[in-house]
């Protein structure tokens, strides 16, 4: 895989700023706490309310601007208080440790008031602040702990003294931390265990990081994980120390010197229990999660500009990544993914993205399992037809993390405008779309399935509800490997704009149906006669008795009149895989739309293209077998 720079935490990974509101009964020391923080000394004269204070990002531990807001019952109305509550990211409820009345008001007034004014679905963290600890020789924690256990929104409790400057900076650090690294989404204090959503997210992270898919993180994988998350590797002794901590508490936390999933989850539970939530949050955010433990839109759908008349393809680095992904899950090394292997691959997805139609869109083995070539073909198809979905899928697989790229947009090549290709009479594209047009029952499905090497016998086994309107496979033209994407266009009187857009058209008629060719001729005249899109007419079911077509001109004369190659005889009723000649011709026409019709009619032109395909198919098979031996 390509090495690159580590992606820093993006602005979207954490809140852009933190707004802290201090509330509590009069004279508990709210204003004094703020002024002591700012001036680093206890104020002799304290105003009724401190002005809003902004602490710049460069002086806070988390490098996030922080706004501290004071509340004064004497100066502000209930409406203003409600507005401040709605704007706050975290609220510090201040009480005086020497004033039982102010402690009682925490539960009788402040927590109910805050809960009434906040959305039930959005969790607003609370910090309980016991001020004036310099005035007593005892702690209020015995009284406060039951309150903390009752209200899960309470992140922590801090006892401090504005007069002695005790725990002042810690108080605001904990408040900031409660916003940026909240405990609530991660951990359930009552159960003393991580929440299901957190376990699910960390399990996905573990599976992505387990690059050899052996169920453990070995030293190399742990070091890579440490480096991409924290920008620093772990020393060998530090790695061993971590594993020893796990061994001490879990019998199955370490296996074969590697950290198991249970061990990985235990470590994060330990971080959270010891107040090191930021460690777990750093990992979660590095892998694309937001505060609700959902993958962010910025992570799944990075910006990718696609100008008109341009297409999207996977680049070389993306194919290398997908090859390694396939290898990771092809446990039996048969160059195909069984249903269980495919299910294992998709465990890092929130849903199974491929339906049964995919098995009839790409190449499969005799068992109907997607082959290595079929796997790459399906990704190629998704990239071409729906690049946003491709970005999403690559995001689930952790592409940007494992390849150390800014985002999965780096996996995509946006081709140049097709008009430039026509002007320069050459193309850099590797994927070509062919729309297959004809009346229902003319043999279009046979054409699509033949691209995948399936004869009529295999096609008859396809269930109607598993049928696909697409087929994609590689085709060699002049020694170059290209992808040909066939799209079965449903029969209709007029084609839509989307059904016309393609690189080449395959007009299919049934030689046994006298009314079949008329539709092809009509569609050609309506949409393609004056366009620059090359067309090829295919005479399907050519193994059967041919009847005369009920059209004013025969298919052969029609092709001659419109300077097209002659009709191509085609059948999928063969003992072995059907001939790929028409697919070489279609791909060649898509690659060289500027080639004259005289050249297209030339047998030597097609012979050169087909010869390159044959040679490279043989070479490709030899290389494939060599790869199999290596694996």
UniProtKB/Swiss-Prot annotation:
The answer to whether the entry has keyword tRNA processing is: no
Kindly state which reaction or reactions the protein catalyses. GTP + H2O = GDP + phosphate + H(+); ATP + H2O = ADP + phosphate + H(+); UTP + H2O = UDP + phosphate + H(+)
Residues involved in GTP 2 binding: 441-446, 460, 541, 543, 571-572
- Topology feature Mitochondrial intermembrane, residues: 629-631
Q: How does it sit in the membrane?
A: Single-pass type IV membrane protein
| Binding-site residues for Mg(2+) 2, renumbered to this chain | 441
Keyword vocabulary terms for this entry: Acetylation, Calcium, GTP-binding, Hydrolase, Isopeptide bond, Magnesium, Membrane, Metal-binding, Mitochondrion, Mitochondrion outer membrane, Nucleotide-binding, Repeat, Transmembrane, Transmembrane helix, Ubl conjugation
The record lists the membrane-crossing segments as 606-628
Q: Which family does it belong to?
A: Belongs to the mitochondrial Rho GTPase family.
Entry function: Atypical mitochondrial nucleoside-triphosphatase (NTPase) involved in mitochondrial trafficking. Probably involved in control of anterograde transport of mitochondria and their subcellular distribution. Promotes mitochondrial fission during high calcium conditions. Can hydrolyze GTP, ATP and UTP.
Q: What is this protein called?
A: Mitochondrial Rho GTPase
**Gene symbol?**
Rhot1
């Amino acid at each position: 895989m390509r090495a690159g720079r580590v992606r820093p935490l993006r602005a979207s990974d954490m809140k852009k700023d933190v707004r802290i509101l201090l509330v509590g009964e009069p004279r508990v020391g709210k204003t004094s706490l703020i002024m002591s923080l700012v001036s680093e000394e206890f104020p002799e004269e304290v105003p009724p309310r401190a002005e809003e204070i902004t602490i710049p990002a460069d002086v806070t531990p988390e490098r996030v601007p922080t706004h501290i807001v004071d509340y004064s019952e004497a100066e502000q109305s209930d409406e203003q208080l409600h507005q401040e509550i709605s704007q706050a990211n975290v609220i510090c409820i201040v009480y005086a440790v020497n004033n039982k009345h102010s402690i009682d008001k925490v539960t009788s007034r402040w927590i109910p008031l805050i809960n009434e004014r906040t959305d039930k679905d959005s969790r607003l963290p609370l910090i309980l602040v016991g001020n004036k600890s310099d005035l007593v020789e005892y702690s209020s924690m015995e009284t406060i702990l039951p309150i903390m256990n009752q209200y899960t929104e309470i992140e922590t409790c801090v006892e401090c003294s504005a007069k002695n400057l005790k725990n002042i900076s810690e108080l605001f650090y904990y408040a900031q931390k409660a916003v940026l690294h909240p405990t609530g989404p991660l951990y359930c204090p009552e159960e003393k265990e991580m929440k299901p959503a957190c376990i699910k997210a960390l399990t996905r992270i573990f599976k992505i990081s387990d690059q050899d898919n052996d169920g453990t993180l070995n030293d190399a994988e742990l070091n890579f994980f440490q480096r991409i998350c924290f920008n620093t590797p772990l020393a060998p002794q530090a790695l061993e120390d971590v594993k020893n901590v796990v061994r001490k508490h879990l019998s199955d936390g370490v296996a074969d010197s590697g950290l198991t999933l249970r061990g990985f989850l235990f470590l994060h539970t330990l971080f959270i229990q010891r107040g090191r939530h930021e460690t777990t949050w750093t990992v979660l955010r590095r892998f694309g999660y937001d505060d609700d433990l959902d993958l962010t839109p910025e992570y799944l759908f990075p910006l990718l500009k696609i100008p008109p008349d341009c297409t999207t393809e996977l680049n070389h680095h993306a194919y290398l990544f997908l090859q390694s992904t396939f290898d990771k899950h092809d446990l039996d090394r048969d160059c195909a993914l069984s249903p269980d292997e495919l299910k294992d691959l998709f465990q890092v997805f929130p849903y199974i993205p491929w339906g049964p139609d995919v098995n009839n869109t790409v190449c499969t083995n005799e068992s109907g399992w997607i082959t290595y070539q079929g796997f790459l073909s399906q990704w190629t198809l998704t990239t071409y037809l729906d690049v946003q979905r491709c970005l999403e899928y690559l995001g689930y697989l952790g592409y940007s993390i494992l390849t150390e790229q800014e985002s999965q947009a780096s996996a995509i090549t946006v081709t140049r405008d097709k008009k430039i290709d026509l002007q320069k009479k050459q193309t850099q594209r590797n994927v070509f779309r062919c729309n297959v047009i004809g009346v229902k029952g003319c043999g279009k499905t046979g054409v699509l399935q033949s691209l995948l090497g399936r004869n009529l016998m295999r096609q008859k086994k396809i269930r109607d509800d598993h049928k696909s309107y697409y087929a994609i496979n590689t085709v060699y033209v002049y020694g170059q490997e290209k992808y040909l994407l066939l799209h079965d266009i449903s029969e209709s009187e007029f084609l839509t704009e989307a059904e016309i857009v393609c690189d080449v058209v395959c007009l299919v008629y049934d030689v046994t149906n006298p009314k079949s060719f008329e539709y092809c001729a009509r569609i050609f005249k309506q949409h393609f006669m004056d366009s620059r899109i090359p067309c090829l007419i295919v005479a399907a079911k050519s193994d059967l008795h041919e009847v005369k077509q009920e059209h004013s001109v025969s298919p052969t004369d029609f092709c001659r009149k419109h300077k097209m190659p002659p009709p191509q005889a085609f059948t999928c009723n063969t003992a072995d895989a059907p001939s790929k000649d028409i697919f070489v011709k279609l791909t060649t026409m898509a690659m060289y739309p500027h080639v004259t019709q005289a050249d297209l009619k030339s047998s030597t032109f097609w012979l050169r293209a087909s010869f390159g395909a044959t040679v490279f198919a043989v070479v490709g098979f030899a290389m494939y077998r060599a790869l199999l031996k290596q694996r």
